[in-house]
From Swiss-Prot:
It holds the Pfam family bZIP_1. One of its GO terms (molecular function) is DNA binding. Expressed on the flanks of the shoot apex. Disruption phenotype: Slightly delayed flowering. In the plants missing both FD and FDP, fd-2 fdp-1 strongly delayed flowering, even in the presence of high FT levels. It comes from the Eukaryota. Keywords: DNA-binding, Nucleus, Phosphoprotein, Transcription, Transcription regulation. Belongs to the bZIP family. Residues 163-213 form the bZIP domain. Self-interacts. Interacts with FT and FD/BZIP14. Interacts with CPK33. CDD domains: bZIP_plant_BZIP46 (cd14707). Transcription factor required for the transition to flowering promoted by FT. This is bZIP transcription factor 27.
Length: 234
Protein backbone atom coordinates (compact mmCIF):
# COMPACT_ATOMS: atom_id res chain seq x y z
CA UNK A 1 0.00 0.00 0.00
CA UNK A 2 2.78 2.41 0.91
CA UNK A 3 4.75 1.47 -2.15
CA UNK A 4 1.77 2.14 -4.40
CA UNK A 5 1.25 5.54 -2.76
CA UNK A 6 4.90 6.41 -3.27
CA UNK A 7 4.69 5.29 -6.87
CA UNK A 8 1.63 7.45 -7.50
CA UNK A 9 3.31 10.41 -5.83
CA UNK A 10 6.42 10.00 -8.01
CA UNK A 11 4.26 9.76 -11.16
CA UNK A 12 2.33 12.87 -10.20
CA UNK A 13 5.55 14.77 -9.52
CA UNK A 14 7.10 13.70 -12.85
CA UNK A 15 3.92 14.61 -14.74
CA UNK A 16 3.84 17.99 -13.05
CA UNK A 17 7.52 18.61 -13.89
CA UNK A 18 6.99 17.54 -17.53
CA UNK A 19 3.92 19.76 -17.86
CA UNK A 20 5.74 22.70 -16.28
CA UNK A 21 8.77 22.21 -18.57
CA UNK A 22 6.52 21.93 -21.64
CA UNK A 23 4.62 25.06 -20.63
CA UNK A 24 7.89 26.93 -20.07
CA UNK A 25 9.16 25.75 -23.46
CA UNK A 26 5.93 26.81 -25.15
CA UNK A 27 6.01 30.22 -23.49
CA UNK A 28 9.72 30.70 -24.39
CA UNK A 29 9.06 29.60 -27.99
CA UNK A 30 6.08 31.96 -28.24
CA UNK A 31 8.16 34.78 -26.80
CA UNK A 32 11.04 34.01 -29.19
CA UNK A 33 8.59 33.87 -32.10
CA UNK A 34 7.07 37.21 -31.12
CA UNK A 35 10.53 38.69 -30.63
CA UNK A 36 11.63 37.45 -34.06
CA UNK A 37 8.45 38.91 -35.57
CA UNK A 38 9.09 42.27 -33.89
CA UNK A 39 12.71 42.41 -35.04
CA UNK A 40 11.77 41.53 -38.62
CA UNK A 41 9.11 44.24 -38.63
CA UNK A 42 11.58 46.76 -37.27
CA UNK A 43 14.18 45.76 -39.88
CA UNK A 44 11.62 46.04 -42.68
CA UNK A 45 10.52 49.43 -41.38
CA UNK A 46 14.13 50.63 -41.25
CA UNK A 47 14.71 49.42 -44.84
CA UNK A 48 11.62 51.28 -46.07
CA UNK A 49 12.60 54.46 -44.23
CA UNK A 50 16.15 54.25 -45.60
CA UNK A 51 14.93 53.86 -49.20
CA UNK A 52 12.50 56.78 -48.77
CA UNK A 53 15.27 58.91 -47.28
CA UNK A 54 17.64 58.02 -50.14
CA UNK A 55 15.04 58.92 -52.81
CA UNK A 56 14.30 62.15 -50.99
CA UNK A 57 18.01 63.04 -50.96
CA UNK A 58 18.23 62.33 -54.70
CA UNK A 59 15.22 64.56 -55.41
CA UNK A 60 16.66 67.32 -53.25
CA UNK A 61 20.03 67.06 -55.07
CA UNK A 62 18.37 67.34 -58.52
CA UNK A 63 15.91 70.13 -57.65
CA UNK A 64 17.29 73.72 -57.52
CA UNK A 65 17.29 75.16 -54.03
CA UNK A 66 15.26 78.36 -53.57
CA UNK A 67 16.59 81.44 -51.80
CA UNK A 68 13.89 81.47 -49.13
CA UNK A 69 14.21 77.74 -48.45
CA UNK A 70 15.69 76.73 -45.10
CA UNK A 71 17.82 73.59 -45.58
CA UNK A 72 18.41 73.12 -41.85
CA UNK A 73 14.77 72.13 -41.20
CA UNK A 74 14.73 69.46 -43.89
CA UNK A 75 18.08 68.09 -42.74
CA UNK A 76 16.85 67.91 -39.13
CA UNK A 77 13.61 66.15 -40.17
CA UNK A 78 15.56 63.67 -42.27
CA UNK A 79 17.85 63.07 -39.32
CA UNK A 80 14.86 62.34 -37.09
CA UNK A 81 13.31 59.99 -39.68
CA UNK A 82 16.61 58.21 -40.31
CA UNK A 83 17.04 54.88 -38.46
CA UNK A 84 19.77 54.47 -35.91
CA UNK A 85 21.59 51.48 -37.38
CA UNK A 86 21.64 52.63 -41.02
CA UNK A 87 24.60 54.82 -42.12
CA UNK A 88 23.79 58.06 -43.99
CA UNK A 89 23.61 57.67 -47.79
CA UNK A 90 26.46 59.10 -49.90
CA UNK A 91 25.88 62.45 -51.65
CA UNK A 92 24.80 62.20 -55.31
CA UNK A 93 27.46 62.94 -57.96
CA UNK A 94 27.24 66.26 -59.84
CA UNK A 95 25.17 65.93 -62.97
CA UNK A 96 25.98 67.35 -66.37
CA UNK A 97 23.16 69.91 -66.04
CA UNK A 98 24.79 71.51 -62.98
CA UNK A 99 28.13 71.70 -64.85
CA UNK A 100 26.45 73.39 -67.84
CA UNK A 101 24.64 75.89 -65.59
CA UNK A 102 27.88 76.67 -63.76
CA UNK A 103 29.60 77.39 -67.08
CA UNK A 104 26.88 79.32 -68.90
CA UNK A 105 24.87 80.97 -66.11
CA UNK A 106 21.47 80.17 -64.65
CA UNK A 107 19.75 78.15 -67.36
CA UNK A 108 16.72 75.82 -67.29
CA UNK A 109 17.57 72.22 -66.53
CA UNK A 110 17.54 69.81 -69.49
CA UNK A 111 14.95 67.00 -69.60
CA UNK A 112 16.00 63.67 -68.06
CA UNK A 113 17.80 61.22 -70.28
CA UNK A 114 15.53 58.56 -71.78
CA UNK A 115 16.38 54.92 -72.17
CA UNK A 116 17.50 53.95 -75.67
CA UNK A 117 15.19 51.63 -77.54
CA UNK A 118 15.20 49.95 -80.93
CA UNK A 119 13.34 52.88 -82.51
CA UNK A 120 15.74 55.51 -81.18
CA UNK A 121 17.96 57.35 -83.65
CA UNK A 122 21.73 57.47 -83.86
CA UNK A 123 22.09 61.12 -82.75
CA UNK A 124 22.84 62.15 -79.19
CA UNK A 125 20.14 64.07 -77.37
CA UNK A 126 22.57 65.61 -74.89
CA UNK A 127 24.35 67.53 -77.65
CA UNK A 128 21.01 68.84 -78.89
CA UNK A 129 20.04 69.99 -75.42
CA UNK A 130 23.36 71.80 -74.92
CA UNK A 131 22.97 73.50 -78.31
CA UNK A 132 19.44 74.57 -77.36
CA UNK A 133 20.71 75.93 -74.06
CA UNK A 134 23.42 77.95 -75.81
CA UNK A 135 20.91 79.25 -78.35
CA UNK A 136 18.43 80.22 -75.62
CA UNK A 137 21.02 82.20 -73.62
CA UNK A 138 23.61 83.67 -76.05
CA UNK A 139 24.48 86.55 -73.73
CA UNK A 140 26.28 84.34 -71.23
CA UNK A 141 28.16 82.64 -74.06
CA UNK A 142 29.21 86.03 -75.48
CA UNK A 143 30.36 87.17 -72.04
CA UNK A 144 32.40 84.00 -71.57
CA UNK A 145 33.94 84.44 -75.04
CA UNK A 146 34.69 88.09 -74.22
CA UNK A 147 36.43 87.09 -71.01
CA UNK A 148 38.45 84.50 -72.96
CA UNK A 149 39.50 87.15 -75.50
CA UNK A 150 40.48 89.52 -72.69
CA UNK A 151 42.59 86.79 -71.13
CA UNK A 152 44.29 86.13 -74.47
CA UNK A 153 44.94 89.86 -74.98
CA UNK A 154 46.42 90.13 -71.53
CA UNK A 155 48.66 87.16 -72.27
CA UNK A 156 49.78 88.71 -75.56
CA UNK A 157 50.38 92.09 -73.90
CA UNK A 158 52.45 90.47 -71.18
CA UNK A 159 54.49 88.59 -73.80
CA UNK A 160 55.03 91.80 -75.78
CA UNK A 161 56.11 93.77 -72.72
CA UNK A 162 58.44 90.94 -71.73
CA UNK A 163 60.01 90.96 -75.21
CA UNK A 164 60.38 94.76 -75.13
CA UNK A 165 62.08 94.60 -71.74
CA UNK A 166 64.47 91.94 -72.97
CA UNK A 167 65.30 93.99 -76.09
CA UNK A 168 65.89 97.17 -74.04
CA UNK A 169 68.10 95.27 -71.61
CA UNK A 170 70.14 93.88 -74.51
CA UNK A 171 70.58 97.38 -76.01
CA UNK A 172 71.69 98.77 -72.63
CA UNK A 173 74.21 95.97 -72.22
CA UNK A 174 75.62 96.64 -75.68
CA UNK A 175 75.88 100.37 -75.01
CA UNK A 176 77.65 99.82 -71.69
CA UNK A 177 80.09 97.38 -73.34
CA UNK A 178 80.82 99.93 -76.11
CA UNK A 179 81.44 102.67 -73.53
CA UNK A 180 83.81 100.45 -71.57
CA UNK A 181 85.72 99.57 -74.75
CA UNK A 182 85.98 103.28 -75.68
CA UNK A 183 87.31 104.17 -72.22
CA UNK A 184 89.87 101.39 -72.42
CA UNK A 185 90.99 102.52 -75.89
CA UNK A 186 91.33 106.16 -74.77
CA UNK A 187 93.39 105.09 -71.76
CA UNK A 188 95.74 102.98 -73.90
CA UNK A 189 96.14 105.85 -76.40
CA UNK A 190 96.96 108.23 -73.57
CA UNK A 191 99.56 105.83 -72.22
CA UNK A 192 101.12 105.40 -75.66
CA UNK A 193 101.37 109.20 -76.08
CA UNK A 194 102.95 109.53 -72.65
CA UNK A 195 105.49 106.84 -73.49
CA UNK A 196 106.40 108.53 -76.77
CA UNK A 197 106.81 111.90 -75.03
CA UNK A 198 109.02 110.38 -72.37
CA UNK A 199 111.16 108.63 -74.97
CA UNK A 200 111.74 111.88 -76.90
CA UNK A 201 112.56 113.70 -73.64
CA UNK A 202 115.02 110.99 -72.72
CA UNK A 203 116.75 111.24 -76.10
CA UNK A 204 117.01 115.04 -75.81
CA UNK A 205 118.46 114.79 -72.34
CA UNK A 206 121.04 112.26 -73.52
CA UNK A 207 122.15 114.59 -76.34
CA UNK A 208 122.40 117.53 -73.93
CA UNK A 209 124.51 115.48 -71.57
CA UNK A 210 126.92 114.57 -74.37
CA UNK A 211 127.24 118.21 -75.36
CA UNK A 212 128.04 119.21 -71.79
CA UNK A 213 130.74 116.56 -71.58
CA UNK A 214 132.39 117.82 -74.80
CA UNK A 215 132.34 121.45 -73.62
CA UNK A 216 133.93 120.56 -70.30
CA UNK A 217 136.75 118.67 -72.01
CA UNK A 218 137.64 121.65 -74.28
CA UNK A 219 137.72 124.06 -71.33
CA UNK A 220 140.22 121.88 -69.49
CA UNK A 221 142.61 121.88 -72.48
CA UNK A 222 142.58 125.73 -72.78
CA UNK A 223 143.46 126.18 -69.13
CA UNK A 224 146.55 124.03 -69.50
CA UNK A 225 147.98 126.12 -72.39
CA UNK A 226 147.59 129.53 -70.67
CA UNK A 227 149.71 128.80 -67.56
CA UNK A 228 152.56 131.34 -66.70
CA UNK A 229 156.16 130.09 -66.55
CA UNK A 230 157.82 132.89 -64.45
CA UNK A 231 156.67 135.67 -62.20
CA UNK A 232 158.40 139.07 -62.65
CA UNK A 233 161.89 140.06 -64.10
CA UNK A 234 164.87 141.36 -61.96
Amino acid sequence: MLSSAKHNKINNHSAFSISSSSSSLSTSSSLGHNKSQVTMEEVWKEINLGSLHYHRQLNIGHEPMLKNQNPNNSIFQDFLNMPLNQPPPPPPPPSSSTIVTALYGSLPLPPPATVLSLNSGVGFEFLDTTENLLASNPRSFEESAKFGCLGKKRGQDSDDTRGDRRYKRMIKNRESAARSRARKQAYTNELELEIAHLQTENARLKIQQEQLKIAEATQNQVKKTLQRSSTAPF
